[in-house]
Structures are given as C-alpha cells and as structure tokens.
Amino acid sequence: DEGCVTFEGLGKLGEDLGIDASSDTKLLVLCWRLGAEKPGCVSEEEWAKLGSEPSLPTCDKPVTLETLKAGWSTLDPAFLENSDFRPFFKFCFEFNREGTKKFLERDTALALLPICIEDRSKHTKTFLEFLETKPEDFKINRDQWCSFLDFSLNVGPAPDFLGWDADESSWPILLDEFVEFAMAKK
C-alpha cells in the first residue's frame, strides 16, 4: 500500500530495534497505540502519532530509533489491565487479517495467539494443540478469537474447567469442541 508501513516495514523496524518482529508483542502494542485501522498497515497519519500519542515512549520527544529503543519496555502488554487488554487482543485479530477477510487462517492463529495472549491464559497450550488437529484450511473468526480470551479469563484450567457449563454456555461451538478435546486428553 502506498503511504503505508506494512508487515515488511514493521519487520525492518524490528531489525533496526534488534527485536524479532514476528514474535515481539510490543510491536503489536505500538501499532495498536498508533490506532492502525487497516490490516497489516500503519498509515502515514497513524505513524505521525509517534511524537504526540501520550501512551507512547516517544511522546513530546524527537522520534528517533534511540528514543523508541529507550522506551520499548513501556510497550509491554503485561502492563495492560484487562479492560485495556481486551481491545488490544481484538486489535491483534483485526490487524493480522488479510485484506477484507473476516477470519484468520489456522496457521496465522497458531502463530499469533501465543504472542498476543502471552501468559494470560492457562488454556493456550492445549488450545493450540486442539487447533493443530483442525484441517489446514480451518479459519477462526473474530467471535471465536475474542471468546477464547473471555473463556481464558472466566473458566478454570483442565481437567475441571471450573465455571464451564456445557448446557448453559453460550460459547462458540469451537470452544465446546475444545473442552471435549481437552477432557479426552486426561
């Protein structure tokens, strides 16, 4: 895209910062705080917020690689409260979609989920194992993605899944299937 920092440009920024752009969550936090609206793209207008967005380490400073490096740790999502983390988690889905698609490919979700959710879920490892059993062309929609976060915050770990009620739940079917998968493993 013309006038847009794409995944390739973000990868280059990662190299310049000495980080792995494909696994450093702080890069996603940066894009989220810049207000990136298009999947895989930070516009020039959004990028210009580096010098003015109060939640960024470069606010009111000359925007240089050094100022960004110096404040990089402030972009750690571990500092986000749950009320801020939810919009960030949803952003991770939206930003990593391809174009106008309303879903993530299975392999994208497998790579992205552990980066985005980090240690906020006791279910991540088993959920990733579950997703790997799905066909390669399996897709995850936004409701399933966001519901996994809610599930993670509200349902206890396997094998008990305290807080889970299969008869009364309104979780997406994918999460019902996940619980069945996890219970069969025990």
Language-model features, listed with the residues they occupy:
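Acidic Ca2+-chelating loop motifs
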Residues: 1-11, 34-54, 61, 98-109, ...
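Surface-exposed interaction/gating patches
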Residues: 81-119
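Eukaryotic acidic, Ser/Thr-rich intrinsically disordered low-complexity regions
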Residues: 141-186
